[in-house]
């Protein structure tokens, strides 16, 4: 006779039509969470009927930690934009007695897949992506089991919650500003612009739309990027800074006729500024430079970078609040049948790195 299949909380959740997190919390007698007597009875009766063996006593503290743990998936931590997001997530999580665990993928699809396999078997409070997931279908599958929130430009086909920035609008806003200053030849400096990197694509598209709306020749926009192989070969923790530095040096060696450099984010823009300074150029006298994200370093007096603000700290807090509210509202609902979408409007922050083009 074959060995009988072990009944899990997932089996019970599917049997009665409740979320796995709800079933797990009831069976583990989770503190500080209340469920109706009807819901508790449904779960306990189903567990008994299916033959569920509660082994929570063997790892009670670790199970409790998992139920109250939010996993944050970041590409890397060298960009202070991600550090700010994580700080805001931790800040808000403490209010709801959540702990936060951060993992990095370096935007590697295989690494992301391995984490998916691990996370799909855990009873977590929720997952927050700080960048668009490489495999949308797998993130959608996770959302059927627990709250999943992405921060940033929302990818097509996603069926999970999001706290968004309209990247096209952000790119258009900056492009419009530079054009109004008189910059009609602009180089867009970016890490690889590929299908999955939608924030980079959207910001670049926004710049193009700004040119089109003002009747300017889009051929005067130069996209300066590198291959994925080149990007992955950069041996430094400050990878985005290095991208900005190397691509700007290439543009200068090629004799660019652009009067402004627009970087896909502030860390890349800092690399642009360093390259220009190393070659003896003055900013904004010789070249204007701008970025996106308004990280802390951008506001320092010696840098004073023109950029786009999009409420980074608030977005991290909102992501945690979405997870918390999902647990409150879905105690009697199967899975998570509704999707929340919040969008922040970009704001132009004008500082000292931009001005009228050189004569």
Region locations from a protein language model:
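N-terminal helix-turn-helix/winged-helix DNA-binding helices
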Residues: 2-8, 47-81, 85, 96, ...
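An alpha-beta-alpha
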Residues: 174-217, 336-353
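Append "Primarily bacterial transcriptional regulators
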Residues: 12-13, 43, 287, 348
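Hydrophobic alpha-helical segments within soluble ligand-binding/sensing domains
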Residues: 163-189, 209, 241-251, 269, ...
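Short beta-strand elements in bilobed, periplasmic/extracellular small-molecule ligand-binding domains
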Residues: 93-104, 208-241
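Short coil turns linking two alpha-helices in DNA-binding domains
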Residues: 19-24, 36
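Flexible loop/turn connectors
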Residues: 249-359
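Flexible loop/hinge segments that line or gate small-molecule binding clefts
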Residues: 130-173, 193, 267, 293-305
